[in-house]
C-alpha cells in the first residue's frame, strides 16, 4: 500500500499502528488516515511546522526537512519494532529528549528484546530505522522483497516462536484498560 502511494508521489507522514488495519480473515493490510499526506513535490510544510506522531516520525520529518517515501518506511520500522517487542524504539520524558534520541541515538537492537527473531529480520529493522534516508530501503517494494525472502526461509526447529498474543500481551487494548 505504501509503495503504491509513493509511486503516486504521496507521502503519508503519519504511519503508526492506529493507521494500519489488518483483516486476518483475508490477510489484507490497509493503510488508513491520509489526512496529513502530501505530494512529494510539496512534502515540506511551513518552516518549523511538524505534523505527525512524534514517536513514529523520522529524523528528517522531526527536523522539518523535506520527506519522501523513505520517511514513511522509517515510521513503518518503528511500527514493526513496537509490534515485535511491545515497546517503542525511543522513549523519553520530554519531547526535546525524544527528538534528540530519534535524531542522534541508535535504537536498541530488536534482538535484545526478542532474541528469538531471525537475524535477517533484525537487519531489516535496523535498516528501516537508519538515521539517514539514503541508508534505508529505497522503496516499499524493496522492503517487501526483503520481508518475503525472510518469510520464505525455514524456521529453525529449536527456535522459540511465541504465539501472536505473547508479543503484544503487554500492549493495552482499547476499552480494556491499561
Label every PLM stretch briefly:
Residues 163-178:
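C-terminal or otherwise distal, non-catalytic regulatory regions appended to signaling enzyme catalytic cores
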Residues 30-33:
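Pre-DFG segment of protein kinase catalytic domains
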Residues 13, 18-21, 53-159:
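C-terminal lobe helix-coil module of Hanks-type protein kinase domains
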Amino acid at each position: 500500500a505504501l509503495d503504491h502511494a509513493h509511486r503516486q508521489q504521496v507521502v503519508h507522514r503519519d504511519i503508526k499502528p492506529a493507521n494500519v488495519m489488518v483483516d486476518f480473515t483475508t490477510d489484507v493490510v490497509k493503510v488508513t488516515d491520509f489526512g496529513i499526506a502530501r505530494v512529494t513535490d510539496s512534502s515540506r510544510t511551513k518552516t518549523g511546522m511538524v505534523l505527525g506522531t512524534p514517536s513514529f516520525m523520522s529524523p528528517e520529518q522531526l527536523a522539518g526537512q523535506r520527506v519522501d517515501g523513505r520517511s514513511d518506511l522509517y515510521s513503518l520500522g518503528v511500527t514493526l519494532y513496537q509490534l515485535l517487542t511491545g515497546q517503542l524504539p525511543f522513549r523519553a520524558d520530554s519531547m526535546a529528549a525524544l527528538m534528540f534520541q530519534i535524531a542522534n541515538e541508535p535504537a536498541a537492537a530488536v534482538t535484545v528484546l526478542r532474541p528469538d527473531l531471525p537475524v535477517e529480520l533484525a537487519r531489516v529493522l535496523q535498516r528501516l530505522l537508519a538515521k539517514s534516508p539514503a541508508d534505508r530501503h529505497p522503496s516499499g517494494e524493496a522492503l517487501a522483497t526483503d520481508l518475503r525472502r525472510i518469510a520464505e526461509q525455514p524456521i529453525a526447529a529449536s527456535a522459540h516462536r511465541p504465539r501472536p498474543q505473547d508479543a503484544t500481551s503487554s500492549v493495552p487494548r482499547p476499552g480494556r484498560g491499561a
